[in-house]
């Protein structure tokens, strides 16, 4: 197989949660442990940083990576989902995994993958560990895929675990209360390690404290020590930056200082290519893309909207099945012109599903590019266009813009 055929096999032949939903989710560590053993890999031969939580995992991984790069370390990152290219998920510094490595890996291990019945995510994680091990990264930053306790990434023994925050998402799998969700996330806390918690929550703090006591693990709540320093005018990114800084400090790196931290924050785009977090993709009118897809995310973007001056606001939304749309759109300004579209995946909410979720009539077009063109035609140069609801909208809209 060439690379295009290999990528197609990975994306379309393996059970893929992002495309198919919970039917493709394969919880548990038995199969991934078998896979790692078949690959002759060891789950503790790298210096791991394990990042979980509901929101902010990806940006936290990116800021940790950027700061460590400025300290002259070779840093691997494993994140999800990807926006434009599968290879975004596996990087060393800001260099995507080589196509040739992916093709060779799948060719060599295809029969093992099929015999074990591995999911897309399990294969991707095995690929990442193989790549980082071969390239002898100094640190490997691993983002949890879903939950924590039963996530494929939970076979690692990290130097430090991070839980950014706890909010409602994937409730059909993780549970429908914050306490149940926190219990799943707390599964990444390992014995005699460290835990960094980004945001305090009176409903979940004790769960993390008790788990850390059981594991003889040190716990740090970032909000107790972060101070008043503002690194970004995007509030939720500022929280994630503080979490990233405390994570890097917990590694006790002698060369780490305030100047290196400052450079890491300033050079985030150069070092990591971070995208999808209140990303400006057009001007006159201002066009923003944000990957918010749950209540906490929509609350954050509503806060950002309140800081911007504009004439009218146009919001293009696309969702995967299972989203409680009323609980999300209630955060948006009352005078918003709201449009809905479909995503080009089988999990996309349909027109009928969107209509049945809302009390008022909706403007809908199943073609993202067409409705985006319509919005741009109707908007004046002083308006704001916001695209959000799912990372799957990014590729369609970004290419069109």
Could you describe each region identified by the protein language model?
Residues 61-108:
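N-terminal phosphate/diphosphate-binding loop that engages ATP/GTP or pyrophosphate donors
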Residues 159-160, 173-180, 185-188, 193-246:
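Internal gly/pro-rich beta-alpha loop/helix module
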Residues 113-120, 124-199:
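Flexible active-site lid/hinge loop adjacent to a nucleotide/diphosphate
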Residues 390:
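Active-site-proximal loop/hinge segments that shape catalytic or ion-binding/gating pockets
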Residues 45, 134, 139-144, 152-162, ...:
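Nucleotide phosphate-binding/pyrophosphate-handling subdomain across enzymes
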Residues 200-220, 286-287, 326-384:
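C-terminal helical cap/extension that packs against the catalytic core
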Residues 64-69, 132, 251, 358, ...:
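Hydrophobic alpha-helical packing residues
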Residues 1-53, 60, 66-71, 78:
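Short functional linear segments
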